[in-house]
């Protein structure tokens, strides 16, 4: 079942228009864990020519979204606290790694780190999700052949 959940999430991320628009790529997903990368794009630069904080937040949020939903039930964000440590180099690919540090029946806590290609810390985040008691809707479609 775990493999089916991960594969279904991977398919959903590939279809997610927002992720495609930002160039977000899911690199790895496991229960409670995800790695997402983003290539630098001119469209994502701020007025100073650096990757916009909103784009970095979106990278964090994508990794968080994947990691907290890998258990097969719908999980939604309750709180996301981001600290920006430094601006990335203009041409550096960014990588967000989300790690589950606590999970209960109702909530999950995740630490997400964004690093550049030289493994320099760009941003860090602590995020809390609420776990609903419903299966991921796209899993039901897979199980029924839809």
What are these regions (language model features)?
Residues 1-146:
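Terminal targeting signals and extreme-terminal segments of soluble enzymes
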């Amino acid at each position: 079942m775990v493999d089916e959940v991960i594969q279904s999430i991977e398919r959903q991320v590939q279809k997610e228009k927002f992720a495609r628009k930002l160039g977000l790529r899911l690199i790895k997903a496991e229960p409670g864990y995800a790695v997402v990368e983003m290539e630098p794009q001119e469209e994502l630069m701020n007025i100073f020519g650096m990757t916009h904080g909103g784009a970095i937040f979106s990278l964090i949020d994508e990794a968080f979204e994947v990691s907290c939903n890998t258990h097969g039930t719908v999980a939604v964000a309750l709180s996301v606290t981001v600290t920006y440590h430094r601006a990335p180099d203009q041409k550096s690919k960014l990588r967000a790694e989300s790690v589950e540090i606590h999970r209960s029946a109702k909530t999950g806590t995740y630490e997400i780190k964004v690093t550049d290609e030289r493994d320099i810390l760009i941003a860090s985040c602590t995020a809390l999700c609420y776990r609903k008691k419903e299966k991921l809707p796209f899993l039901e479609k897979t199980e029924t052949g839809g």
